[in-house]
């Protein structure tokens, strides 16, 4: 994020795109050559074969009959929808008075992702001490609190809100995706792929809607909409039961 902003200021959008592409290629090569071999891997028939299709369809039916998985997939949808919406449009708020940040300063907002990395690592601790459902509820409440703080015209309070929001999103995502794997024993890969499809669909669906809200009503309406979305996620957790 930071390098692309720096490249855009010096070489334009083409330079920024080239920078991102090169870093992506380097990361792919590192992943290919540094990843250790899979452990406890068991090959299965591809869905293209008759046996594979039957196995895939049977697994899918089993997963779709679990209401808790539907809840977790929906929470993933709502979580990333909120997250992408905030980071898509917070820059427009910060470039306006009373903040009037430069492009380089706006790029530095993504340093707050550091809190997300710490939160993801702490999600296991949260699950052990509070249970996955309670921890997920706490993270959704923290996400809402962070959103409300971004309404402030104080840069310190706004950044605190962004930090809390980011922490809560990454921890919530880690908790929800982990719960999907625990629920879908024997079919974790398929359940996780559905979760990810729902997760990214949330970004695709909510991002443009929030953009229209920003264009018409500005930041307070954006926050109101996203607090409602997070509140829906919080209500859905009640269907998960204690865990």
Residue ranges and their predicted role:
Residues 8, 118-132, 214-215:
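Helix-to-loop junctions at the C-terminal end of transmembrane segments
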Residues 15-33, 221-238:
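Symmetry-related core transmembrane helices of the 12-TM Major Facilitator Superfamily/SLC fold
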Residues 35-75:
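Juxtamembrane intracellular "pre-TM" segments in multi-pass secondary transporters
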Residues 65-85, 163-167:
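Pair of pore-lining "gating" transmembrane helices in MFS-fold secondary transporters
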Residues 84-97:
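Helix-loop boundary and gating motifs at the non-cytosolic
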Residues 95-115, 190-194:
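Loop-to-transmembrane helix entry
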Residues 133-176:
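C-terminal transmembrane helical hairpin of 12-TM major facilitator-type secondary transporters
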Residues 182-219, 225-226:
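A late C-terminal transmembrane helix in Major Facilitator Superfamily
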């Amino acid at each position: 994020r930071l390098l692309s902003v720096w490249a855009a200021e010096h070489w334009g959008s083409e330079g920024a795109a080239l920078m991102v592409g090169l870093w992506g290629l380097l990361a792919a090569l590192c992943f290919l050559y540094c990843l250790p071999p899979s452990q406890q891997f068991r090959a299965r028939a591809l869905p293209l074969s008759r046996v594979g299709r039957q196995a895939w369809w049977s697994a899918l039916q089993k997963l779709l009959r679990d209401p808790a998985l539907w809840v977790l997939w929906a929470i993933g949808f709502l979580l990333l929808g909120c997250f992408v919406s905030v980071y898509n449009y917070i820059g427009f708020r910060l470039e306006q008075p009373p903040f009037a940040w430069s492009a380089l300063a706006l790029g530095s907002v993504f340093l707050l992702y550091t809190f997300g990395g710490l939160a993801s690592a702490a999600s296991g601790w949260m699950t052990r001490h509070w249970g996955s459902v309670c921890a997920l509820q706490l993270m959704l409440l923290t996400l809402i609190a962070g959103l409300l703080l971004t309404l402030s015209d104080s840069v310190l309070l706004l950044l605190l809100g962004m930090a809390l929001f980011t922490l809560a999103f990454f921890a919530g995502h880690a908790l929800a995706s982990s719960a999907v794997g625990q629920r879908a024993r024997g079919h974790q890969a398929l359940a996780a792929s559905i979760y990810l499809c729902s997760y990214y669909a949330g970004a695709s669906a909510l991002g443009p809607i929030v953009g229209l809200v920003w264009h018409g009503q500005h930041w307070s309406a954006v926050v109101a909409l996203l607090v409602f979305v997070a509140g829906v996620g919080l209500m859905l957790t009640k269907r998960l039961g204690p865990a």
